[in-house]
Amino acid sequence: MPVPRLSPFAALRHRNFRLFYTGQTISLTGTWMQQLAQGWLVLQLTDSALWVGLVAALGSLPILVFSLPAGVYADRANKRRVVTVCQALLLAAAALLAVLVATGRVAAWQVAVLAAVVGTVNAFEIPARQSFIVELVGKEDLTNAIALNSSAFNATRIVGPAVAGLLVAEVGIAACFGINALSYVAVLIALQAMRLPPWQRPTAAGGGLDQVREGLRFVRRDPRVLALVLNTAVLSLFGFPYIVLLPVFARDVLRVGAQGLGVMSASIGIGALAAALGLAAFSPHVRRGMLVAWASPVFGLAVAGFAYARWFPLAIATLALTGFAMVLNNAATNTLLQTLVPDGLRGRVMALWALVFVGFAPLGSLLTGWLAGGVGAPAALAAGGALATVVSVWMWGRHAPQVAKLR
């Protein structure tokens, strides 16, 4: 019996999406485990907040370089093949890091190099995967599919860090990297099990540079799309680095250790999951433009509040609020962009969104890590959260009439 369209699980009626969703959920659990373990490993190896920020930055900086050409490639290429190759490369990188840690030969520079490799792969994987979803469910269920993906992303954000915190404390960091490597197998199996129509190479108008310019022109000329992209850039640059500094807060500010770090990361996931499930359930009745306009400054305020929380339960509550606001903003922005953009430009526009969403974060991480070394992690983070709030309020004061009415 078909799933009703207004069901919060409507997109799961599509077999290919069910496969993709299952594989991604398993893989994301491993990804979150590795993210926590990697930050803790770098802090152990270097005892430096700047190094923690640097490695996080190297994991995202390649997206600044490669995202736009990767978006052109995503519009031209077989997206399933691109995602498959990228997932296999990510598996290899995680396995190598697991071996280095298990054998005691790991050094900070090796972690940094592998982070850069992963970032380069992600530059091609993200736009291909984002634009692949619409091929699995069609535009009718796209909003629901994005909300469900966000639910999986954030449910695993609860489980992954919590398990990683226990493993780091009781077994060792290498186990987290090994489990992440194995988790990519689930995605590879799901991709091969899909039943898709034969792929046909699209006819490309102009060279690669011309197609990049075409995508940028579209964004510049549509004030709604431009506002959504600029808002993402502001939050990514000034707000998102709070995640990078969680190991520093866990060890040096709140003094709760690796297990406390797992709880902190999981609390972000709890707030984010609540937002994603709410969006999936009520998506037909929500003005996504209004969600973005309100969630953005709330996120900045929550980051600033966490920076000065010294009571652990209060820190957990503010982190949950950051997760809640962040997912409302990101999921609504993602859906609006994919709805507003023509099919032939979707890969390029989503690549630009990935560039500012993921690629600007390392610049913010470097800046925040540098400031943390001078004025301390709390002051650095509070400044970023406050700046994100002020700029976001100013931006939506100008663009709210155009964006708030979007559904």
Regions found by a protein language model. Name each.
Residues 1-407:
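Alpha-helical transmembrane-bundle signature of multi-pass membrane transport and export proteins
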